[in-house]
Amino acid sequence: MNKLPAHLSRQNCKIASTNLSEIIPRRAAVLK
């Protein structure tokens, strides 16, 4: 497993969290 530079992994975490915050409400809306 490659270790990413800190700034890259931070950026990936931000992207992942924004993706989750966008995807989850959409899925919740679909389920309703």
Swiss-Prot record:
Extra remark beyond the main annotation: Encoded antisense to nanS.
Protein name, UniProt field: Protein YthB
The organism's place on the tree of life at top rank: Bacteria
Pfam families to which the protein is assigned, alphabetical: YthB (PF23516)
Lineage, top ranks: Bacteria, Pseudomonadati, Pseudomonadota, Gammaproteobacteria, Enterobacterales
Induction: Expressed in both exponential and stationary phase in rich medium; expression is considerably higher during exponential phase (at protein level).
